[in-house]
Amino acid sequence: MQPMPLLLRQSLRSSANFARTSLPIRPQFLPAAGPNIRPARDIQRSFSVCVRCQFRSQSPSYSSPEKDTLKDDAATRQSKDASSTLTPRDESPKVEPDAETQRPSPAAGEQDTLQGFDQDAKNEPKREPAEKKGLPSYLEERRSQLSKQFTEMMDNLQSNIFVAGQRLNDLTGYSAIEALKKDIQLQEERLREARQRVREAKDAYAAAINRRSASQREVNELLQRKHAWSAADLERFTHLYRNDHTNEVAEMETQDALSAAERESEEAAAQLSKSILSRYHEEQVWSDKIRRMSTWGTWGLMGVNVLLFLVFQIAVEPWRRKRLVKGFEEKVIEAIEKEKAINHIEILKPQPALTSTSPSSKEEAAEPTPTSTATKDTPTTDENTPAATDEAITSEPVVWDSDPTPTIVTNITPETATETTEDSAPKSATINLVEPRKPHLSRILPPLPPSTSLDSWRQTLNELFSDRSMVITQRDLTTVTLQSAAAGAAIMGLVIALIRPR
């Protein structure tokens, strides 16, 4: 007896054979007895026996590339399944084509072309339809990540603010006061309910009293006409006499309920008053703590401001002043060097003309009455200061002629080129270019920061309270005024806070 999986496999094979035999068999082409009516096309044969699959593989240009690839994959899977189901036991008819009827396989170049077309179709970007571009989902997909994060942050802004406020309340201790507020609200609701129960108990007690009073009045009326009772009056009297005890018990119960409701209402009112007083006390303590923290915070800010002021006045301002002075000195020195370079160039330009003059011009220049031309900008000489003469000699270029004696030339023009004598060179013809600028620099440059000695600090304090006239801008004056006003207000507030009676 065969197992169940084998029987199922044989049944599936037989059904596949029946399906194969039901398909029409392609007719064979007869041998070529005459000219072919239809030229043979190079068709890329598939290993599938399905005619529809062959048709799909032959016409890839009639449909979109993506659909063709999907259909080809499905056909390939179907052909694989069909080929796997075929076994040597199947006795399906097989058609052996002749050698003449076999068609040649397509060339390798055509296969490469078809594969290139399929690859291009796969790599082609998917085009979005025009009607889809206006949909909200399409716009949502095209939004940037930053925009999405910003939108999410704005959506959660209210909750974030609430959470931040809750954290601040936890830090400052106001959360306990919030809990007291909620407790007070619950107690107020409890007090309202207790008062409502008191009113209901009063109404029930009053109704019980009225009901018992009415019963007693009716009993009294019946007793007054006792000699004339009828059967109905006797039955009524017995009924009222039985209900009198019930009415008395109901009256006592309603009275007890009223007393309990009144006690509960009083307890709720007392608890509410106690909670309100506790909340008031806690809020006072919290406000004192916040006020104390704000006072210390104000003192801390004032200390930071004073510290920054001292740091700027002691460290930053001298450094900035020194840097400005250094930069100004560098610019002045650079300007002086540029002026020296210009004068040097002007002096060296006519030198070839002097060396190429004739002996007659040299004799005329060596006459006992030399003339020296000086410009209006030439400074005066100073014979009493040897240091100034040295600086002048080093700053002024010296022109050497055939005569070994050096001569200092102040200003030489191409028209009048003269030489100074030997006696006027080192002593009387020294030109000082740096000395006239020193008083000017001393007037412009700001004073350097004082040293750390006691005399220097005393001198600085004396200068702070001296009668020296200074130039100040309106901005600096306004800044100093505002700082003084703020400092005065802070000091007065501190004094008032210290001397204020508790």
UniProtKB/Swiss-Prot annotation:
Taxonomy, superkingdom: Eukaryota
UniProt entry keywords in alphabetical sequence: Coiled coil, Membrane, Mitochondrion, Mitochondrion inner membrane, Transit peptide, Transmembrane, Transmembrane helix
Segments on the Mitochondrial intermembrane face: 317-478
Membrane side Mitochondrial matrix: residue ranges: 500-502
GO cellular component, one term: mitochondrial inner membrane
Family as reported in the entry's similarity comment: Belongs to the SHE9 family.
Protein name as annotated: Sensitive to high expression protein 9 homolog, mitochondrial
Organism: Neosartorya fischeri (strain ATCC 1020 / DSM 3700 / CBS 544.65 / FGSC A1164 / JCM 1740 / NRRL 181 / WB 181) (Aspergillus fischerianus)
Gene behind the chain: she9
